[in-house]
Each structure stands twice: as structure tokens, then as C-alpha cells.
């Protein structure tokens, strides 16, 4: 009798995706992040579901309902802290996953890459609307500031903002619809993840060398299932250490105060994973210019495949491009730091220089380095 996993219509799909999938024999731990992101998504959906059972999306009771979850619901504190810090783990894995894609040239699988960028945008949108739900000071003012950016759009801006708010300010209607968005978006993410995997399995995985690995493939199970479980154990350990020992380390103290439209916090800033984009937004004195730079900082990922000039796919054997890649990494860390600082000197100028360097590295220096490295492979002298 033939094995059921190879004949049953549903099992066959799972078999070709996770068991008998031919995988390159040399992929490193940097290829673990896809599965880790899948686990993050499952954790977020499950903890979120249990939170939604006790949460009320009304301005008068939202803050109290979150306090009630933490105080009175069985293990509510754990579910809430896992959900909040799970988001941080999600973005940590996302940034490393994208960084891996840039370093090893995985972006040349264009469909997979583009779906991945869309996924990044949807996850960012989900995190933003989710941050508003506890209805603390930073939730309220974060929602006010970020939604207000849309008013920079010429002609329709103000109408658009009031349409999203459901009134003339962030209020009950805004909170209710943000809860609805926060509930539906993760399921849209699941659908996009399936499409992401579908396109990936059309081509097979890339590998560190950037060379076609078809001549040497091994089955995904047991080799990479075991390897993924190791990465998973590290991630779960990190998440539990964060959740159980310092659950509020990455949060903002202002969010322990209920939302008050009459009192603005001294420094309005988003969660750490948005700070790099927030720094780019703030570094441009013009409102519309800032919004466009903010969008460009993420959407620039879509044109990275078009900026690939090298004859080699990966950065593994390209020391000049490697140096620029790590400069870009340092640059993003600098932007993240600046995004959390008040708007005063010397932070303003550092932010402006870092923002300019970010675009300069991606748009000009890295493609130029690729061309130079091509020349160095076969110098004309």
C-alpha cells in the first residue's frame, strides 16, 4: 500500500511543503526565521484570541478590561505579556529574515520577495492598530499622530483622516474599528503566508553561496525539521525570559495611564520596531515630505531586485558590498536610537544624516559596489 501522505489530496500538499521538500544541503541558521515567523504568527493568533474573549472595545472600558485581564483572568497576565512581547519577537525575526534576504540575494525570487514586502506592511499595520487597543496615553496619542499624517495628502487628506477616525477626533468609533481590523488582519496574513510559500516552493530555497543548489538537495524532514526545532527552542526561551522577567521592558511607561485627550505626553513615540521609520519621518521638516520618506523607507524594498548589479547573487564573496551591508545595519540601529530621542540637537542632525545615508546606501552605494566588484573579477588593465 502506498504511503497515505503521498496519496491523500491534503496530506500530499503538506508532504510536498514540509516533509519531502527538496532543500539545499548548505542552508544555515539564517534560514530558520521563516519557520520562527510562522510560530510567532500562531502564538499571536492564539494569545490574541484569548485576549479578545475578555477585551471590550469601548473607550470607557478598554483600559479597565486590559487591567481586568491582567488581574482577574486565569493566567491573563501571561497571555497579555506573551502577546505584547510576542509582537517584539515577531518583528525581531522579521527584520533578521529581511536582512538575510538582502545579504544572500534571496530578493531575486521576485514574486516571493514582493509578497514578503506586502506581508511586512500588513504586519506593521496590524501591530499599529493593536497598539491602540489598550487605550493608554501612548495608544491614544500614537493613533492621533500617525493617522493625522494622512492629512498631508493633497485635497482629500482631511476627509480621509475624518473617515478613518469615524468622527472629528480619535474616539469610540476609531477604537471599535481598530479592534475589528486587528482581529481580521492576522487571518489575511495567514493567507499571504500561504501565497509566499507557494511562490517559494516554485523555485526552491536560495542558499548562502548564491549558486544553483539543484545538484545537491536533501529532504526537509528530518534534517531541517530538527534544525528548525533548535531555532524554535532558542526563540521560545528568549520570549519566555522577556515575558516572565521583564515584561514591560520594551513598552512605554505612558501607556500605564488611561488615554486623556486633554493631556499630551512629553514625547510621543511608537514601539521600538517602528522607531527607524519614525526617525526618517521626523528628519524631514515638511509634513508631506516626511510622509513620503516614511513610505519610501519601507517600499524601497520593492525596488531592491532592480538595483542588483552584481554577477554574483550572494554577498558571501563580495567584501565591499558586505561592508556596505553592515554599514546599513549600523545605520538602521542609529535610526532606531534617534527615533526614541526628543526632537532637539544633536539628535536632529544625527537623524537627518542617518536618514540620508540610509537611502544613499541602498540606492547608490550598494549598486555601485556591485559594478565595481564585477570589474574587479576581470580588470581591464
UniProtKB/Swiss-Prot annotation:
Cited SUPFAM superfamilies: a domain/subunit of cytochrome bc1 complex (Ubiquinol-cytochrome c reductase), Transmembrane di-heme cytochromes
Pfam families, per the entry: Cytochrom_B_C (PF00032), Cytochrome_B (PF00033)
Location in or out of the cell: Mitochondrion inner membrane
Binding of heme b b562, residues: 83, 182
Bilayer topology: Multi-pass membrane protein
BP terms from Gene Ontology: mitochondrial electron transport, ubiquinol to cytochrome c
Cofactor annotation: heme b
Entry binding sites for heme b b566: 97, 196
Top-rank taxon: Eukaryota
Matches recorded under PANTHER family: CYTOCHROME B (PTHR19271:SF16)
Family recorded in the similarity comment: Belongs to the cytochrome b family.
Note in the entry: Heme 1 (or BL or b562) is low-potential and absorbs at about 562 nm, and heme 2 (or BH or b566) is high-potential and absorbs at about 566 nm.
Subunit field text: The cytochrome bc1 complex contains 11 subunits: 3 respiratory subunits (MT-CYB, CYC1 and UQCRFS1), 2 core proteins (UQCRC1 and UQCRC2) and 6 low-molecular weight proteins (UQCRH/QCR6, UQCRB/QCR7, UQCRQ/QCR8, UQCR10/QCR9, UQCR11/QCR10 and a cleavage product of UQCRFS1). This cytochrome bc1 complex then forms a dimer.
Name of the protein in its database record: Cytochrome b
Gene: MT-CYB
